[in-house]
Amino acid sequence: MADDLDILRNDTLAALAGAQDRAQWDAIRVGTLGKSGALTGLLKQLGRLEPQERKERGQALNRLRDELTAAIEARGRDIEEEALQARLRSERVDVTMPAPAVVTGTIHPISRTIEEMTAIFGAMGFSVAEGPDIESQWHNFSALNTPEHHPARTEHDTFYLPPKNEDGEPRVLRTQTSGVQIRTMLGSKPPIRIIAPGRTYRADHDATHSPMFHQCEGLVVDRNITLGHLKGCLIEFLRVYFDKPNLPVRFRASYFPFTEPSMEVDIGWSKATGEIGGGSDWLEVLGSGMIHPRVLANCGLDPAEWQGFAFGMGIERLAMLKNGIPDLRSFYESDLRWLRHYGFSAFLPATLTEGV
């Protein structure tokens, strides 16, 4: 009976030697060691033999099973290694070939302008404050000394939202980020030095206006703050932002409900060429003023002890002036060609201003 074991051994080893892939190898393994395999069938026949013969036959079958199991496992490892080497040869990469071009995104001009403004004011000691886009009328208007009859409160200029808040007031999409200034003065003790960039909303839409746009407002509250501090801060910002150390800057008397005195700020430019800092024309870029005493009082600050100044500017407007962008609506059209042209590399710093 040993002859049949030798035949099974030789046939199995020969089949393993000829196996070329995992499927052939697995068929041999199942056909030999599986539940219906040849060796398993011989083991099942042991019960029919006499005790002494069963003992000898069983020992021989166990030795054969161990031998074939080891041979099958070894051949399986060899087949896997051969398949790996074949795949590596077929997938060989020539590292001397040029890498495929990678299309990278760009930083949106609005995001980059906010980064630049944050860096410049950060070097002056300002921090960034944020607030909700949906405001109460008190934070958006009343606390800022804006009277009930002011045209900014009408639905022609402001988006009102239902339902009313817990005080019965209709909520609004903020028309300015000044509400952040109010929240900061209510929640923080002076001295305060913040800027508040963010989205604002007004019912207007044309080449130079959008129903949603971005503003950056600034606030300084401290003792003995004067108009000279305001002028020095804004002149420094504008000259660094436009990279014009001698940029002409002019302050004109104006009116805002929340500042007194109030001033519009103009920069020198050429109307004919659009050059910033050139020519004899003036271009308005932002509004500013000393914080109105009523605004300070509304926030629990004594106007006799604390003074301050505030300013606000349109982020899109500054981005358009600096980068030669002609139409405000282009900022929101998601045109990849426009973004590639006016966008900024993510690997370049926003500004070289010290303190970033």
UniProtKB/Swiss-Prot annotation:
<keyword id="KW-0648">Protein biosynthesis</keyword>
<comment type="similarity">
    <text>Belongs to the class-II aminoacyl-tRNA synthetase family. Phe-tRNA synthetase alpha subunit type 1 subfamily.</text>
</comment>
<dbReference type="Pfam" id="PF01409">
    <property type="entry name" value="tRNA-synt_2d"/>
</dbReference>
<dbReference type="InterPro" id="IPR002319">
    <property type="entry name" value="Phenylalanyl-tRNA_Synthase"/>
</dbReference>
<keyword id="KW-0547">Nucleotide-binding</keyword>
<dbReference type="GO" id="GO:0000287">
    <property type="term" value="F:magnesium ion binding"/>
</dbReference>
<comment type="subunit">
    <text>Tetramer of two alpha and two beta subunits.</text>
</comment>
<dbReference type="InterPro" id="IPR045864">
    <property type="entry name" value="aa-tRNA-synth_II/BPL/LPL"/>
</dbReference>
<keyword id="KW-0963">Cytoplasm</keyword>
<keyword id="KW-0030">Aminoacyl-tRNA synthetase</keyword>
<protein>
    <recommendedName>
        <fullName>Phenylalanine--tRNA ligase alpha subunit</fullName>
        <ecNumber>6.1.1.20</ecNumber>
    </recommendedName>
</protein>
<keyword id="KW-0067">ATP-binding</keyword>
<dbReference type="InterPro" id="IPR010978">
    <property type="entry name" value="tRNA-bd_arm"/>
</dbReference>
<dbReference type="InterPro" id="IPR004188">
    <property type="entry name" value="Phe-tRNA_ligase_II_N"/>
</dbReference>
<dbReference type="GO" id="GO:0000049">
    <property type="term" value="F:tRNA binding"/>
</dbReference>
<dbReference type="GO" id="GO:0005737">
    <property type="term" value="C:cytoplasm"/>
</dbReference>
<dbReference type="InterPro" id="IPR022911">
    <property type="entry name" value="Phe_tRNA_ligase_alpha1_bac"/>
</dbReference>
<dbReference type="Pfam" id="PF02912">
    <property type="entry name" value="Phe_tRNA-synt_N"/>
</dbReference>
<feature type="binding site">
    <location>
        <position position="260"/>
    </location>
    <ligand>
        <name>Mg(2+)</name>
    </ligand>
</feature>
<dbReference type="GO" id="GO:0004826">
    <property type="term" value="F:phenylalanine-tRNA ligase activity"/>
</dbReference>
<keyword id="KW-0460">Magnesium</keyword>
<dbReference type="InterPro" id="IPR004529">
    <property type="entry name" value="Phe-tRNA-synth_IIc_asu"/>
</dbReference>
<keyword id="KW-0479">Metal-binding</keyword>
<dbReference type="GO" id="GO:0005524">
    <property type="term" value="F:ATP binding"/>
</dbReference>
<keyword id="KW-0436">Ligase</keyword>
<dbReference type="GO" id="GO:0006432">
    <property type="term" value="P:phenylalanyl-tRNA aminoacylation"/>
</dbReference>
<dbReference type="InterPro" id="IPR006195">
    <property type="entry name" value="aa-tRNA-synth_II"/>
</dbReference>
